[in-house]
Amino acid sequence: MKNIIKKSISQIFSPSDSEAIVQEAQKQIIRQLDAPSRRLFLQRGLTLGGVAMLTGCDISDNASVENALGKISGFNDRVQGWLFGSTRLAPVYAESMITRPFPFNAFYAEDDAPEVDGNAYRLKIAGLALDKREWSLPTLYKMAQVSQVTRHICVEGWSAIGKWGGVPFGDFLRLIGADLTAEYVSFKCADQYYTSIDMATALHPQTLLALTYDGQILPRKYGFPMKLRMPTKLGYKNPKHIEVIEITNTFTGGYWEDQGYNWFGGS
């Protein structure tokens, strides 16, 4: 693994003729950036020597900084992908440890959460799948479901334990004849949110197409009619109010990812 990482670093960054003190570089870069997401990325996302790698860029040049950050973010995505696997499971907890009330979190106020008509709702499938029929909630509710008590970890620094129930997403993808060799699965939501994940995460045994919370139909504030629950990912990677699922080889980014958040977003 060490050799792979060294090779990737050499491919991403050209040799620098100057040296810089890593801590001072980090301080100056943080001062250059106004976006909270970028500061957070520097403080929490620059792993595996990422800050040291920045010393080859001109930190007085915002464009240079942005370019370096993009390269490091992509590098982090690849490293997280290398470390990820179906046998690496997130911890599970006893129901007595559930956080009550479970916090609401979104890029809007709770009262502004979308009101989706469950009777009219149809989940749409797009992209590389054989079966593109639309799915009603009654049909989805009839599918075999499992539940999990896992920790939701927010990029903002807080966490909470909750109980989600739903259809293992890998089972659903196989049922619709999704191309499991495709690179990505992307999601479009009723609240205008969007994100995407890699296929390995989609097929992970703990990734759920969540339809319930704490034994009840998924409440509006938690993502009715469905959300993708991934305890292996940070909270912003777990889309709510899902309307469209697309299997694709085209990278589609995400709402927060397009503003600087790490795309892989592993927790």
State what each model feature region is.
Residues K27-T55:
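N-terminal secretory signal peptides and thylakoid transit peptides that target proteins
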Residues M1-S37:
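N-terminal secretory signal peptides
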Residues S8-I9, A25, S60-S267:
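Structured, non-membrane catalytic/scaffold regions adjacent to prosthetic-group chemistry
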